[in-house]
Design a protein with these regions (language model features):
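Short polar catalytic/cofactor-binding loops
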Residues: 7-11, 112-115, 231
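Short N-terminal binding/cap micro-motifs at the start of the first secondary-structure element
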Residues: 11-16, 117-118, 235-236
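Short, high-confidence coil segments that cap the C-terminus of an alpha-helix
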Residues: 28, 80-82, 104-105, 195, ...
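Short, flexible, basic/aromatic active-site loop/helix in glycosyltransferases
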Residues: 122-139
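Catalytic core and acceptor-binding pocket of nucleotide-sugar-dependent glycosyltransferases
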Residues: 137-240
Length: 248
């Protein structure tokens, strides 16, 4: 298993919990980070914590989109095609258990377990990027783009397709922040070319928490990865104290 992430303009305070939580799981695989506009102190911090830091002097497009193309390049450059890779956001991801046990050709977790049409943010993202496909997608359960896991050769192709599709989307200025582009493009691909690779069985790999304020604490137990926990006022403290829980 390889962990692959990307960031820019974050401090140690922003990513420290991500770095330390993975370390606390006992993860022994490779850890690779793409770092745009690098600062020497942050490079040193990451390298001291066992990360391979791949730096870029600029980020021509919005990072959530640009990272997909650069992740694909890196997978091929580092010959990671046969590895299982966990591609994640960095600031709001917490590892409770080592992800090395997750061996899926392609895994995406549901955003909030509701159809795209029932979520205003996902609806707007798809309507902006792919208005002609909204009718086809509106009753599909939205996938979250913050954590994507799979075999390297599949992810490299997925990310290349993601980049080409996004360049031709309805988002007109993708050098500026356009947070809906990444996730809407992931959903278009997930429900078309890559649908046959996805496992729709219930699992406890990743929990996306932004819209789970009404969830009971007992329903949070046992996941490998928690995403967007900082947005969840009710359960944030539960997540940040996970390494003290007896069931992990």
């Amino acid at each position: 298993m390889v962990i692959l992430t990307a960031f820019t303009n974050y401090s140690k305070d922003n990513i420290g919990r991500f770095v330390s939580s993975l370390e606390q799981t006992g993860f022994t695989g490779r850890k690779i980070v793409i770092y745009y506009y690098p600062k020497p102190s942050m490079v040193e911090y990451l390298e001291n914590n066992g990360w391979e830091v791949h730096t870029y002097g600029n980020c021509p497009l919005f990072i959530n989109f640009q990272r997909r193309k650069d992740m694909s390049k890196l997978i091929l450059e580092y010959k990671l095609e046969e590895e299982y890779i966990c591609c994640t956001d960095i600031r709001d991801v917490y590892f409770a258990k080592t992800p090395s046990d997750i061996k899926e050709d392609l895994f995406l977790g549901y955003d909030d377990n509701s159809p795209i049409a029932n979520n205003e943010w996902n609806t707007q993202a798809v309507k902006t990027g792919y208005p002609s496909l909204y009718k086809k997608l509106k009753n599909k359960i939205a996938f979250n783009a913050g954590v994507i896991i799979g075999k390297g050769k599949i992810l490299a192709e997925f990310f290349d397709d993601h980049y080409e599709l996004g360049l031709n989307s309805g988002y007109t200025n993708i050098s500026e922040p356009c947070p809906g582009l990444d996730q809407s493009t992931v959903n278009v691909l997930a429900y078309s070319k890559y649908k046959h690779l996805l496992s729709f069985k219930e699992n406890k790999y990743v929990l996306h928490m932004a819209n789970l304020d009404n969830t009971e604490e007992s329903q949070l137990e046992g996941y490998y990865i928690y995403h967007q926990y900082e947005r969840n006022k009710k359960h944030k403290e539960y997540v940040v104290n996970l390494n003290k829980k007896s069931y992990i």
